[in-house]
């Protein structure tokens, strides 16, 4: 080995210290793969500023950014899941629950809060998809019924942000029963003349889409949200036909009348508050009082020329 090769040998070269970048500062859009400053993405409600892709949002953050500050009260937080069936597949259900609670920071897959949106009273609930795929079990059903009862008690509307893969298989029939339980609760809400607005986010599938998510007086979808019962691959294998482009996306569902409207997440507060106000007979938060309108400049109507 020559003297030059010894100098250039990697072991003799002092490596330059890499600048350490704290984790969580940068992230990447899951659609266009644009590198994004995470703080800016948070301010934009998890919507990519380049391609407007709506990323999945934590349930608690969704409610905290949707409801007015200072008026939020959580409901049903004392309810916790139990492994009554002692269920075990590749892993015990208790272990799955513990892992999901640690990863998501929630006790179960639904968060319920009472509050107001732009001054309009409302009870709102949101699914936490990172908790076992937002699956609906007995606690999710119980918390949703608690939300319905709170809406009836306070004579206000109910809104639910769905993000779920469906019923929780580890709870077997008890999870399937929640489909009927939540649907019956919404029937009581309807009998009292109170509105239910369902917002379907990406993804809303399975037993949740087949029950509470599609029972809204107004059904709203977020842009490009996956909404349906069975997955595309399962349907294609069953019917043995190729499905059209964009099948089960919110735009496709709107075009075919399955949902009522698509609303950008950044416009959700104003749109929902306006709908709730109209459906409950309250003053719309978007309507400005006539007394608050700016005064017009004085204008004199010219007299018509008199004929001599």
From Swiss-Prot:
**Residues that hold Zn(2+) according to the record:** 29, 32, 48, 51
Could you give the cofactor binding note from the entry? Binds 1 zinc ion per subunit.
Q: In which pathway does it act?
A: Lipid metabolism; malonyl-CoA biosynthesis; malonyl-CoA from acetyl-CoA: step 1/1
Which InterPro entries does this UniProt record tie to the protein? Answer: AcCoA_carboxyl_beta, Acetyl_CoA_COase_Trfase_b_su, ClpP/crotonase-like_dom_sf, COA_CT_N, Znf-ACC
Q: Can you state which reaction this protein catalyses?
A: N(6)-carboxybiotinyl-L-lysyl-[protein] + acetyl-CoA = N(6)-biotinyl-L-lysyl-[protein] + malonyl-CoA
The alphabetized UniProt keywords are: ATP-binding, Cytoplasm, Fatty acid biosynthesis, Fatty acid metabolism, Lipid biosynthesis, Lipid metabolism, Metal-binding, Nucleotide-binding, Transferase, Zinc, Zinc-finger
Q: Which Pfam families match?
A: Carboxyl_trans, Zn_ribbon_ACC
Gene Ontology biological process terms, A to Z: fatty acid biosynthetic process; malonyl-CoA biosynthetic process
What is this enzyme's class at the first EC digit? transferase
MF (Gene Ontology): acetyl-CoA carboxylase activity; ATP binding; carboxyl- or carbamoyltransferase activity; zinc ion binding
Q: Where are the zinc fingers (C4-type)?
A: 29-51
Cofactor names from the entry are: Zn(2+)
Q: Name one GO cellular component term.
A: acetate CoA-transferase complex
Q: What EC number(s) does its UniProt record assign?
A: 2.1.3.15
Cellular localisation? Cytoplasm
Is Cell inner membrane included in the keywords of this UniProt record? no
Where does the CoA carboxyltransferase N-terminal domain start and stop, copy by copy?
25-294
Q: How does it assemble?
A: Acetyl-CoA carboxylase is a heterohexamer composed of biotin carboxyl carrier protein (AccB), biotin carboxylase (AccC) and two subunits each of ACCase subunit alpha (AccA) and ACCase subunit beta (AccD).
Q: Which HAMAP family match?
A: AcetylCoA_CT_beta (MF_01395)
What does the function comment of this entry state?
A: Component of the acetyl coenzyme A carboxylase (ACC) complex. Biotin carboxylase (BC) catalyzes the carboxylation of biotin on its carrier protein (BCCP) and then the CO(2) group is transferred by the transcarboxylase to acetyl-CoA to form malonyl-CoA.
Q: Which PANTHER family match?
A: ACETYL-COENZYME A CARBOXYLASE CARBOXYL TRANSFERASE SUBUNIT BETA, CHLOROPLASTIC
Q: Which family does it belong to?
A: Belongs to the AccD/PCCB family.
- Entry-linked NCBIfam families: accD (TIGR00515)
Q: What is this protein called?
A: Acetyl-coenzyme A carboxylase carboxyl transferase subunit beta
Q: Which organism is it from?
A: Vibrio cholerae serotype O1 (strain ATCC 39541 / Classical Ogawa 395 / O395)
